[in-house]
Amino acid sequence: MGIFSIANQHIRFAVKLACAIVLALFIGFHFQLETPRWAVLTAAIVAAGPAFAAGGEPYSGAIRYRGMLRIIGTFIGCIAALIIIISMIRAPLLMILVCCVWVGFCTWISSLVRIENSYAWGLSGYTALIIVITIQTEPLLTPQFALERCSEIVIGIGCAILADLLFSPRSIKQEVDRELDSLLVAQYQLMQLCIKHGDSEEVDNAWGDLVRRTAALEGMRSNLNMESSRWVRANRRLKALNTLSLTLITQSCETYLIQNTRPELITDTFRELFETPVETVQDVHRQLKRMRRVIVWTGERETPVTLYSWVGAATRYLLLKRGVISNTKISATEEEILQGEPVVKVESAERHHAMVNFWRTTLSCILGTLFWLWTGWTSGNGEMVMIAVVTSLAMRLPNPRMVCIDFIYGTLAALPLGLLYFLVIIPNTQQSMLLLCLSLAVLGFFIGIEVQKRRLGSMGALASTINIIVLDNPMTFHFSQFLDSALGQIVGCMLAFIVILLVRDKSKDRTGRVLLNQFVSAAVSAMTTNVVRRKENRLPALYQQLFLLMNKFPGDLPKFRLALTMIIAHQRLRDAPIPVNEDLSVFHRQLRRTADHVISAGSDDKRRRYFGQLLDELDIYQEKLRIWEAPPQVTEPVKRLTGMLHKYQNALTDS
């Protein structure tokens, strides 16, 4: 396929994007909005953003969800701008500097919250800056400008959502159904590999792939939840299926680790059962029936606890999977599964990374302000806006440098493209709304094709071109103003890129260490006799942290194995029959406090000291377990955990 070819699957979204732009343009001029450009720009960004992220037409609900986030972010930004202006209108320079700090603060928050919701915070930061900069000449018009901006953005979002509904968006439901079947087959094949106890690298690749697929399934669940209210029951089941899938991975990997020291625990009966190859979910269903009969026949006590737990989790997975596919009423048995343990939310391990993002964004905006004041450039406000937009959006993504490069390419491409529209097309079509709409529809259609291919610069070119062409009411054609706007965008992107290059993000190793210590803390916190604490479901949070670790350190198998071992220790200790008495309960609290000190330690020396204290306390704890005659189900996991912490002490304490 050629570089400029158009694939059939890309046409529908390109038409959808063109329709959203035309609708926003028509409504903006019909209702005599002062700057219909904002409505058109909003419609284009809201529609094209999810397509660029997905690399194709986004699934149903994605555009609506992004639109809602944009509305929330705009209102937060407008309120913040009003507060800043009212408080500091007599000190314009201080007002702009405080607004720069606000943009950095919003970027800091967006780096800590869920990636799906971070868009609203990033948007609220640069919305406030846009308002503060725009009203410099007429500060008394601030409330009117904020209201107009909110109205234009709501119109643009409404047009994007309407266009999405008109062109029958794709439903993700069929993809979810297929993935549920495929995932269960892959889970069974992972257990086969672990029972065989073959090549460790093959097992690592298999469970790593399953962790990624389970995380992807959770993302599909979010999309399905956004799609329609009729999937509420399926959404509840998919939440439980996420935990069950992670449980299956954990039990399989623990089965592999157990065979390193006690291979005799896996009897020949189960080895023969798992030798049967499976290709479909029906094959897995038949095998599970056979296993349940064998477990009933041999008895629970004669069945390895990991296999017993795995078969139970796989059976529950099958039951909920059928419910998701049929979307029928939740049965009493399913309700019992769904009313399981409360899920504990993950605590961010990227606080240092978020602070780096804060300084990058704040310094970029302050540098832009100083450049504007020093040069007295008439388009300094446009340059400031681009700095805020680029840094706010780039900081939330894994590779901010590439986002900046994308914007630089986009603004460079927007210069000749905008020139064509400014000098030739718009002056010759402004007398006819039909021709004006058609000209912008053509722009939206062809850039919509490139956006779906994730062409470098396509997203930036779409936003930058719409931003510099004349779509105001009434239209005025001042070439110097156009050139200033176009150059301001380019300079703003380049200044943001320079700051990102100069302010290095060296938080990767620190984030990795914090993640590993959080795994240790989770394993230690599982040693408790508190009934409420034992019922907490930390598995999704732990695997979310493992997924982040895999993304931060691709190919670092020792880190992945250590993290997985800590997750297995957490699950085993959580279910272990720890003796209930006051002496152990007090010591459990002491262990948790020490583990928390390890995570929060500000220096390597403190961290080593607290980690050494934790190891000493674990040795004392093992002695207490011996005194209180704890069963092997408790003493063996604690001994394995202590051994792992001794072995990887340097990796867990050094920066």
Swiss-Prot record:
Pfam families: FUSC. It is a multi-pass membrane protein. The chain crosses the membrane at residues 13-33, 38-58, 69-89, 93-113, 121-141, 152-172, 370-390, 407-427, 431-451, 459-479, 482-502. Residues 34-37, 90-92, 142-151, 391-406, 452-458, 503-655 are cytoplasmic. One of its GO terms (cellular component) is plasma membrane. Forms an efflux pump with AaeA. Could function as a metabolic relief valve, allowing to eliminate certain compounds when they accumulate to high levels in the cell. PANTHER family: MULTIDRUG RESISTANCE PROTEIN MDTO, P-HYDROXYBENZOIC ACID EFFLUX PUMP SUBUNIT-RELATED. This is p-hydroxybenzoic acid efflux pump subunit AaeB. It comes from Salmonella paratyphi A (strain ATCC 9150 / SARB42).
